Amino acid sequence: MASLLTKPKPVFLCSPSLSPRTLNTATPSLNFTRISFTHHQKLAPFKPPSLVVAFSEKGLKRDVTTAAAATEGDYRRIMLSDVLVKKKEKVVWWEREWKAMDFGAVAVVLSMHLLSLLAPFQFNWRAVSVAFGLYIVTGLLGITLSFHRNLSHKAFKLPKWLEYLFAYCGAQALQGNPIDWVSTHRYHHQFCDSDRDPHSPLDGFWFSHMNWMFDTNTITQRCGEPNNVGDLEKQPFYRFLRTTYILHPLALAVALYAMGGFPFIVWGMGVRIVWVYHITWLVNSACHVWGKQAWNTGDLSKNNWWVAALAFGEGWHNNHHAFEFSARHGLEWWQLDMTWYVVKFLQAIGLATDVKLPSEAQKQRMAFTSD
């Protein structure tokens, strides 16, 4: 059992309720160990898997053994899920190497959370309206439409003035400048749910949710220095945003204070930023733990309806990992995808061009196949 799991090939844990599925050849072959769970398995009382199946780049290799190790403590179950991952040695937070950027990230995230705690004492409807409006502007237009679908995946093209405007909206979400955000996300897709993934639940739910942001040394060890964003680094506008990044949210805070005083700061900055933080982070954590898989992506990505509702369609995450180039994540008519509706509107008025969608042939290649 131990020798099987230590080989440099993806490994999946499969339940007796469903037969093992063949790893789709569209998934890149990587040198890592991967633990997953069965397709469409519903939450139920914990039962150890009955077999282990090892995959290689050539497809399914039926090296099957009993999952005795799963009952002997080699695996742990991720919180409130049916996902089993191999146990790793825990790194004590305060004993690891901390860099200045780590302290800075903790300070920013903590200060926004503390500021949001004042919301009940600074409530007024104008401030709430401003927070909601900025949630749309920074969350939908900035993060999901610009940083994610446009810049990270090139799912469509926009006129440069509009591309830059939406990217500026994303910078106001206080999640990092476009170059760094896009680099991390591209590495996530390249090394998805492996030991080199910047934020995988293989390292625990909370690591994938937020703790990864406070450990730049680990991310550098996994991914190396960012070298996958040359398309953005060659553009002066994005280099400018990287250099001056923190000044832009500060300028917005000053403007909000001038418009509505401290309540606008609490709601328009604190509450809104924390809300968009956790919605974005849930895509990295919850959507790799809770939900269903519609496509044979060979990773832990899930379709999660409630994250999709909060994150403007980003919760259809298994769809996204199956067709990362697609401007549309909610592929079924009933899958709400507000970001796609905005892209579709921009396309209708001639502002979005080269809008990419998966073909029927591509869908067939990513579909689960019966044994």
Curated annotation (Swiss-Prot):
Locus of motif Histidine box-3: 317-321
Keyword Transmembrane applies: yes
Obligatory cofactor(s): Fe(2+)
InterPro entries per UniProt: Acyl-CoA_DS (IPR015876), FA_desaturase_dom (IPR005804)
Motif (Histidine box-1) on chain: 148-153
Entry membrane topology: Multi-pass membrane protein
Main subcellular location of this protein, as a coarse class: plastid
EC number in record: 1.14.19.42
Further remark: Substrate specificity shifts from delta-7 to delta-9 desaturation when the protein is retargeted to the cytoplasm.
Name this protein carries in UniProt: Palmitoyl-monogalactosyldiacylglycerol delta-7 desaturase, chloroplastic
Gene that encodes the chain: ADS3
